[in-house]
Amino acid sequence: MIHVRHTLAEVARVIVGLVFVGSGLLKAVDPVGTALKISQYLAPILSPASAGAETITLALSFVLCGSEFLLGAFLLMGVYRKFCARLSVLFMLVMTAVTLYTLIANPISDCGCFGDAIQLTHLESFLKNVVLLPLSILVLRDARALRHLYSRRERWVPAVLSVVGIIYFMAENYRHLPYIDFRPYAVGTNLREAIAKEEASLQRVLLGATKYIYSKDGKTKAFEASALPDSTWTFVEARQEADLASYKPRYDFNPIDSLGEPVISTLLDSEGITLLLLSPSWRTASQAVLDEISELHEEASRLGYPFYGVTASTSEEIAQWRYLTGASYPMLQLDATPIRTIIRSQPGLVVLRDGKIIDKRAYADFPSVEGVSTYLRSLPQMQPHGPSATRTYLLWAWAALQLLAFLRFWARKLHLTVHLHIKKRLHLTK
């Protein structure tokens, strides 16, 4: 019976640990996105426009992503077992309560449990926590009996490496752009084709959901768009038989110019290179790269590349930005939400080639003043590229740490088994 209980605890430890590691990593990939999700949760008590709100939510994002990953990692490695088991139960109690609240009140669209990688409904998120909570209690009940991959003397080494590693990983994803972009505007996306496909799909849904009511000889009948009656019938009305109010397009990219005219066709149908400098608000945009932005605009103009600023700022904020930076490029208006979805940096650069996103850069990665010309001249041949090698090496290093620990664990177990077998044989010989 005790053996079965310990086995269940071990299985529960692995499940809870893997979920925590996966959830923590998927959120740590995009700490700014996690901060935006936290701000939605805290909106009733902390207005996103209030002073310090962005700093508070970003700090909470780092704490949430880091603690969730570390809890899972420590559980998998079997270090600080009792402490981590208690924290995991506390964590699951809080998360279960939060997901129950979202299930009842529906304050946000999705829970954000796995970042933008996996979007669960409120019910799915709540059921996930209902399963994980008793599993974490199982782990707590037999915490001291759990197998460990590192001894008491050794455990501080993987613990410190894990803490330093996840902090560095999150900092890099914040300073640059997310390690993996799970959003609709990832590098390599052909916006021209993707938006056209979505619009065509919506039109099919609208046509299928619309019934056309005609009358003839005192009788009325509903027809579909593909099978309308002849001219002897009289049109009465069109009815929408499906509720499309909850429909949310995947692509919400429809900027307008200073006259209020849509310019999406101009941007996406243009052949060649188009540069977009985006920021939800010029008031909060970093001023650390003003010289680089000016050089980008001037060199782009010399090469004939269209260059636009895209923002949700007020006219006063735009005027202030022009005064501070000398910006003469045209400004386009777009809601702050799609801007934050497109790029997590303030400001950030998006490069389109024939309607396809070929590069995205946080302001920390803007080319230097001296390197602007080389960068812009490389764009016609540039191929979409992945994240920096540093973060890739970091993830491989952590995976290697786990593999080494498991190999050491099984080597010790094999050594002990062989030792006991030899001892038993010697005893029988005597």
Per-region residue spans from a language model:
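Membrane-interface segments at or immediately adjacent to transmembrane helices
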Residues: Y168-I264
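Juxtamembrane interface at the cytosolic side of transmembrane helices
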Residues: C84, S286-D291, T390, A400-K430
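Hydrophobic alpha-helical segments
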Residues: H3, T7, A12-R13, V19-F20, ...
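Alpha-helical transmembrane segments
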Residues: A73, L133-A145, L401-T417
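Soluble extramembrane regions of membrane proteins in the secretory/endomembrane system
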Residues: R250-G386
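Juxtamembrane/start-of-transmembrane alpha-helix segments at the extracytoplasmic/lumenal side
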Residues: N129, S151-R153, M382-A400
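Internal/C-terminal transmembrane anchor helices
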Residues: Y150-P178
